[in-house]
């Protein structure tokens, strides 16, 4: 998620999207994001945080695939709206799920660790994309590591067992 957020403008610029359109797209993400986060919150309460995370990972996955083929500002805006529709939901559901997995009396320490891993991901993801750009000389192919990272995240999440007795943490 951090990789997508940090590379969106660079990606748009590299495929020929005008700066004004990139800025507009980033604003679209914010306007779509607020109501979408409320929607995902409802879905999380109705089903589960894991369901929201899996669903939003799938949508991110589709967005990354779509990004490999887009070429116009309109397509870039559509991608921005798609990403905006899941960005807040995946972040909120991830934090909610994490809070259900940690000891309540150590939440500060664990959320500090959570943020550290998030920041590490914001460095490692773009580094992988940069490596792929260096190897394949194409930013479109360079988004492949993002797909791999989403797949790995979903695979790891599969093994996470949520203990219902921890639900009082939220």
Predicted segments — roles?
Residues 131-150:
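A membrane-interface helix-boundary motif in multi-pass transporters
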Residues 68-79:
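Helix-loop junctions at membrane interfaces in 12-TM secondary transporters
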Residues 51-66:
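Structural signature of the two symmetry-related core transmembrane helices
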Residues 35-49, 133:
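Helix-to-loop junctions at the C-terminal end of transmembrane segments
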Residues 6-22:
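Short amphipathic helix-loop junctions that connect adjacent transmembrane helices
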Residues 19-20, 104-114:
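Loop-to-transmembrane helix entry/capping segments in MFS-fold secondary transporters
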